[in-house]
């Protein structure tokens, strides 16, 4: 491959490589902190593009978007401006697993994010392909593009996503490509490997898109948006929420035995099973051919037909991800109820790409090998726009703080789902595309959709990404919550006829004695609005989000206190720092497997060491004694 002659270009504080969901958050965070930031990407028409599902949020992921917003990130604001449908999921379950999901106008989402980037001070957007890094004495000093431009920087964030040596596969067809048939980045991976980084090969996939004009909607089940307003951003207003009639519906259908037979008959042409695909695919988002083989007892699989936007007829067939040959895909699509006459506008495909094994990162997302070099998003082995954006935000903040000579930030597992994800990646690594799930969080009752601001907005203000005006509104919300909680704790409800009729209607026993309003509200069937039927209302009406906090904090108080007690115990473990450059082989009594894992991952705290697979409690106890007694054996320089 021919390269341009190298020449000295401009210097920046921070350079972000790749303008996907991770790169956009990283660049905006850095620039908003006052760093001169360059965001360089292969194609300016693909900024924050959605090459896979046209949606944001869902279980765990939706909470990540709220966390990004609570700290001053952009994804929540952007989807609130460009959604075509909004739904709160798991409303019949407890608050720990409720999650917001928005159907996006994918083109408008990209346009809006690009506009935001272009209007942000200190942020320069450029088209280009980064082929190499400038490294001096183990520290990154800039990047080199394929045209030869050498840009200097104090920190660099790599968010190359599936473009890193990307290869698209459709049946027997294979070709080098980034997502959605964009140009791939071929040289950067080679140069990262030369620097000593361990790279892995992962795979993801996408389903066919069909022409909405050729769908028979009468044979599907409509999935409309919510009537009640909800938003990803704490800054969005209820009056701006789209009425249901202005939202676009999704449509539910299913595969059937005929669909499964078509797939079974063509498994000999499926790259998943012929050995063509080398990369490891996502466990929690398998291709349809993988589902048919793994779950052969299931007679059908759920599919959602999702609109890709207001100004396109393309529908995304969620649940039908595939890399089967194009003609097989068309036959498969037409076997499905409602899609008998559907015209495919784009075939599904698999894409292989390079990832940096994430155990090579610190919890700040800086690489251990090269100072000042950060990685985020699918580059680190995750799947999903939200996971990428969460990492991008943290990497951008830390790259920006490093450029200013400030201490970097880390999020603990008890702080945020973003903290859970990063800790999982750097402590355990991943052998497949990592997806955030509520089950990965041991403190999920305190890591809720509704309280992301209470957990993280103070941090966002400290790092300079939450304005004083927004912070004052946040402080006012907190004050209102506490004032109303105090008011309710002093009011007693008397056992009159009206109250007893209400409790008996809900199958409860009548009151014999008076009860505090707070205790009454703790009953599962009592809402705050029910409570106001029996007690005076507050002097000023309360916002629904304040009321939501009051209800949750009272109803789940006992469980929440138990989780916070666990968090305090964890904090004591996190406070026990492990000195750098330990020779674990010289610590007597630690099992060989544990020595090898500890040496490879180099945990920074005793708590992190305890989460490494292969390190058992006995190993941890010995390590703790060595740390406390100062017996640590360091590696000689």
Curated annotation (Swiss-Prot):
Please name the SMART domains in this protein's record: GIDA_assoc_3
Q: Which GO terms describe its molecular function?
A: flavin adenine dinucleotide binding
For FAD, which residues are the binding ones? 18-23
Cellular component GO terms, alphabetical: cytosol
Binding sites annotated in the UniProt record for NAD(+): 281-295
Q: Which PANTHER family match?
A: GLUCOSE INHIBITED DIVISION PROTEIN A (PTHR11806), PROTEIN MTO1 HOMOLOG, MITOCHONDRIAL (PTHR11806:SF0)
Function description: NAD-binding protein involved in the addition of a carboxymethylaminomethyl (cmnm) group at the wobble position (U34) of certain tRNAs, forming tRNA-cmnm(5)s(2)U34.
Q: What is this protein called?
A: tRNA uridine 5-carboxymethylaminomethyl modification enzyme MnmG
